[in-house]
């Protein structure tokens, strides 16, 4: 996934495009995962952030998906907190 993108547009549950600000990208080598953290672009005061997993199909096309596995989410949350503490 292109790492220099500041904003991305994603489809919400209703099929409408919503613009998100990219907070950070990071990789977790232990589980061979790549992740992106985004927040709604139109609400700068929003404390809500979404962590999405980057997956690739056989042709190399990338898609962002929610993290369903609780253990994976816990690892991702720990890695995100580490990344953010290093950026401060």
Curated annotation (Swiss-Prot):
Coiled-coil intervals, chain numbering: none
Signal peptide location: none
Lineage: superkingdom: Bacteria
Family: Belongs to the UPF0473 family.
Name the UniProt record assigns to this protein: UPF0473 protein CLH_1128
Organism expressing this protein natively: Clostridium botulinum (strain Alaska E43 / Type E3)
């Amino acid at each position: 996934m292109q790492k220099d993108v500041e904003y991305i547009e994603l489809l919400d549950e209703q099929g409408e495009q919503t613009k998100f600000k990219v907070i950070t990208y990071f990789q977790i080598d232990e589980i061979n995962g790549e992740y992106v953290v985004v927040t709604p672009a139109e609400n700068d005061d929003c404390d809500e952030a979404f962590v999405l997993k980057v997956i690739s199909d056989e042709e190399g096309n990338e898609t962002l998906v929610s993290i369903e596995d609780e253990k994976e989410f816990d690892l991702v949350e720990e890695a995100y907190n580490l990344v953010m503490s290093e950026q401060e």
